[in-house]
Amino acid sequence: MGTLYGFNAFLKISEEVTWGIAVTSNQSEIRLNSCSLQTAQERNRKTNLSVPTSGMLASVYDGFRTAGGSLDIPIQYNGSGQLIKMALGAATTTSAGAEYLHEYTPAFDLPSGTIQFQRGTNLTDSMEQFTGAKVSSMSMSCEAGGEMTASFDIIAKDSAARTTNMTSTFPAGDSVLHFESGNLVMGGSLTTASMELRSFELTLDNKLERKNILGSKLTAEPLISDVREVTMSVTSLTSEI
């Protein structure tokens, strides 16, 4: 049996109209650094005192079926915005010549997505489709000499059995955002022109939780359960003025 190394693994993501209903059109293709998306079926031991001659409790029943995980991606000019929109809530895009400006704003109703996860190319039937995927947290960082990356924690409704492999057609202009591509600009009274930054890390916690209810092994639609939090840390060079 072949070993699944994960080479050439990637994602295809589409925004859903209705939570948990699969959409496979207008997909964004995203390269991966790592991914732990999976579905797990809990098995709970029955607690009654009826036991076989071994004296062990041998019976179990199905508990919750949980889908989700984390993924780490390189931030690129093309494709990464779909996940950022799912994390923040809303996005507007305007074109100016050959360039595009994307503005992401927080929204209470977070969009969900259908994620098709191709688990490498050295095994057959390695594509798994997750529905009802929502971003519970996001962390984005970049340091001098490196490339910008982001990690996302995903809560999903369910996934289908793995099926036929799919191929990637990454768009042109999807180069990785390297440290020399631009500056970090912050609003407010802080004068960023006087600061030389070595690195930054931006973290968003959407306070999403699974909603386990009677009548289903799957979560209901996760909703924001507390005040969302955004934190940012920067490392800068200091000098006397």
Language model features with spans:
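Signature of extracytoplasmic/envelope-associated structural regions
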Residues: 1-241
